Amino acid sequence: MIGKLKQNLLVACLVISSVTVFYLCRHAMDCHHRIEERSQPLLSSLHATLRTGQNLSTPFIYNKDMPLIFIGGVPRSGTTLMRAMLDAHPDVRCGEETRVIPRILAMKQMWSRSGREKMRLDEAGVTDEVLDSAMQAFLLEIIVKHGEPANYLCNKDPFALKSLTYLAKIFPHAKFILMVRDGRASVHSMISRKVTIAGFDLSSYRDCLTKWNRAIETMYTQCLEAADKCLPVHYEQLVLHPEKWMRTLLRFLNIPWNDAVLHHEELIGKAGGVSLSKVERSTDQVIKPVNVEALSKWVGKIPLDVQRDMAVIAPMLARLGYDPHANPPNYGRPDPLVLDNTRRLQKSPEKPNPS
């Protein structure tokens, strides 16, 4: 009788022990799973994975070594047209201006220029390496997540290219497109369309041309220093000869040719096409096909005293290949496709926009 009681107690102890071990193991697995979940955001900043809506089995992997594309230039220089044409390509996504990226880059530049601030940061352990790593993660997060996934991601924030050299350092495989336009046309567009740009006095052609000269000189110099990583594209030539320049551009970016880039207006608002912002000033222009309407609208609008001093006010005009005294200038003859687009727009009853 006593032997049987001992046997029953032993069985009961074994059952209780087994249940306890099972519970502890399960609890440990749950804790491990939660820790993994909590660590995921930290990992995602270094290695982001998104999935397309079309094929959930195909992930897009993003990291600092991917071939990012940055489009920039002085505002009103064709940056929106360029990004819309690239956005029409099925393998590329640019999207709207983030507005955040040039501001955070300007802040980083300010820290670097101030010897006192840099010393304070170094003393706090916030070294250049720490800041570069943080900038990589922050910028990549913005670029990746503010739009749809794609094989090639691009960012279009015009003044971001003031930091072209730094961007090339933290994104070693990135490429840059610098949009160049006749400064007289860019400035007339800013003033006539009342496009507010920090530091530009829209009541003065002289002031705006001086600021244009300073900004484009900064970006153009960095573009040349970046050598085969940066391609300057003249807005006038892109508009006059879109196929030639888009083929040149896609070869530069190592992206296969696609005819869709010549007809961006047909893909506006469509899935996988061109997404436009309601608040960007160029939106009402890029909904049209490529045309020459805006090329010479500045002629006859610039004050005579500014025209007289143009070569001194804006020496970058001559450096970029524009004649500062030509009024009107001769940019060249448009391709037949562009001529046809322009004629159709001129026959349209829609009121033309100033540019």
Curated annotation (Swiss-Prot):
It is a single-pass type II membrane protein. Residues 26-355 are lumenal. Its EC number is 2.8.2.20. GO terms for cellular component: Golgi apparatus; Golgi membrane. Keywords: Disulfide bond, Glycoprotein, Golgi apparatus, Membrane, Signal-anchor, Transferase, Transmembrane, Transmembrane helix. Catalyzes the O-sulfation of tyrosine residues within acidic motifs of polypeptides, using 3'-phosphoadenylyl sulfate (PAPS) as cosubstrate. This is Protein-tyrosine sulfotransferase 1. It comes from Danio rerio (Zebrafish).
